[in-house]
């Protein structure tokens, strides 16, 4: 009967979250005092502020208002009650109506970037986006500047150095005596891997706190960082690559350097709210191909996620972390990337076990075993924390080995691996058995 249950459970787990992992990693510094990159000259932009009405107005601009920069500016600021709403209306109109000119971009040019030309053609690159923002904002009576510098945009990979002319442009607006950063180019959408423009509004790039903006924007003039302690270009290049969802989900860094040297394995910590789930993956720097299954492992330990990685050979890798809200359907989104320079590797390594989504959702944690392949006939100590579980069992074929409860949420016991895969299952109160972890036969 239990073998039938196992088969059903395995089928139900096809949609579960998968991650891969390792054991004796090199731990990063484990203190929250190290999380801030610098003390930002911050402001109250992150306070809850509803832009629903001003956004609706901007998104419904009639063609008659879009005939010139001055007429468009006049229309956009009609219902604005303050300078913040003026800036928002301009930002929202641009992000909805201007396409990124991928054809010109991939030819290495800029095309027309004058605000009037951009208004007519409805397409440009970052210099055109920032110019039309500048023109509309000034027409609206806002003190505005255009900033040139380096951006970690399309084609960027962790560890890349910037040289030559600036590759990006954005804006800053002065509101109530404070400067606010915004990037209407990146707020409008992105260029996909197949070199096509995808319109997708990203609110992160409107009034972004300087302490977040610096991770992917480096101005030529350090004063436009708006930081108490400006970072150098080299420091900027060394910062970990963070996606907007890293900030949107409330994540915090345990290691801010984007390039890390390691031996055969590494361990990195990410602090995350309780309602956030995470997973990880490993790719080769050259070509972006996945390194294979079993080389990464990600699990929560109270307020942080521990991400482990092993390397099949010496070389350079991109370690990626993905995250999502616990109660939201859909895929995990990329939140950060590290470049790992591994001095050595082990292709014969047993790797890490496969974690199913139920373990992550329950806030479980595997203490042992952490190797992904178990030798048939060998005995292993299984030690796992599973909040809310009434029973936890190790299953090999038709043999079930119940783990003993060792206090609050902790289960442990010895079990012998047999031929085939080994699974760990939990029975939660009032529910059936759920798969938590799977090990392969060595």
Each language-model region and where it sits:
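Bacterial Sec-dependent N-terminal signal peptides
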Residues: 1-25
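Composition- and surface-driven signal marking solvent-exposed, interaction-prone regions
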Residues: 4, 185-186, 282-283
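Secondary-structure boundary elements
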Residues: 25-125, 131-140
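Hydrophobic/aromatic-rich core segments of domains that either
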Residues: 130-212
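Alpha-helical and coiled-coil interaction segments, frequently adjacent to or embedded
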Residues: 192-442
């Amino acid at each position: 009967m239990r073998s039938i249950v196992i088969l059903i459970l395995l089928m139900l787990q096809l949609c579960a979250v998968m991650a891969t992992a390792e054991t004796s990693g090199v731990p990063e510094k484990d203190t929250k005092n190290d999380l801030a990159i610098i003390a930002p000259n911050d402001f109250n932009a992150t306070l809850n502020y509803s832009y629903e009405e001003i956004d609706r107005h901007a998104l419904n601009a009639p063609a008659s208002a879009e005939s010139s920069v001055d007429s468009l500016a006049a229309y956009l600021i009609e219902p604005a009650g303050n300078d913040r709403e003026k800036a928002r209306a301009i930002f929202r109109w641009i992000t909805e109506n201007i396409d990124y000119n991928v054809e010109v971009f991939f030819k290495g040019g800029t095309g027309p970037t004058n605000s009037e030309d951009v208004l007519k053609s409805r397409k440009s690159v970052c210099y055109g986006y920032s110019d039309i923002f500048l023109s509309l904002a000034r027409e609206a009576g806002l003190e505005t500047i255009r900033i040139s510098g380096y951006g970690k945009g399309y084609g960027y990979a962790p560890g890349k150095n910037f040289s030559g002319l600036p590759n990006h442009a954005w804006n800053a607006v002065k509101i109530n005596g404070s400067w606010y950063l915004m990037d209407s180019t990146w707020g409008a959408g992105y260029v996909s891997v197949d070199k096509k423009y995808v319109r997708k509004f990203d609110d992160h790039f409107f009034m972004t706190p300087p302490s977040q903006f610096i991770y992917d924007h480096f101005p030529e003039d350090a004063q436009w960082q708006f930081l108490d302690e400006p970072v150098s270009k080299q420091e900027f290049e060394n910062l970990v690559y963070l996606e907007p969802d890293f900030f949107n989900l409330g994540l915090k860094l345990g290691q801010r350097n984007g390039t890390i040297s390691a031996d055969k394995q590494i361990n990195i910590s990410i602090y995350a709210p309780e309602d956030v789930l995470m997973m990880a993956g490993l790719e080769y720097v050259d070509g972006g191909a996945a390194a294979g299954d079993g080389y990464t492992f990600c699990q929560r330990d109270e307020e942080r996620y521990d991400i482990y990685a092993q390397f099949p050979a010496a070389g350079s890798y991109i370690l990626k972390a993905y995250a999502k809200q616990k109660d939201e359907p859909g895929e995990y989104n990329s939140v950060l990337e590290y470049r790992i320079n591994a001095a050595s590797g082990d292709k014969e390594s047993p790797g890490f076990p496969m974690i199913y989504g139920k373990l992550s959702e329950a806030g479980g944690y595997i203490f042992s075993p952490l190797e992904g392949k178990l030798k048939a006939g060998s005995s292993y100590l299984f030690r796992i924390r599973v909040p809310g579980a009434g029973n936890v069992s190790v299953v090999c074929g038709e043999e079930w080995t119940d783990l003993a409860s060792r206090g609050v949420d902790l289960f442990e016991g010895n079990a012998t691996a047999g031929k085939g895969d080994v699974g760990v299952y939990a029975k939660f109160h009032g529910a059936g058995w759920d798969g938590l972890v799977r090990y392969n036969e060595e």
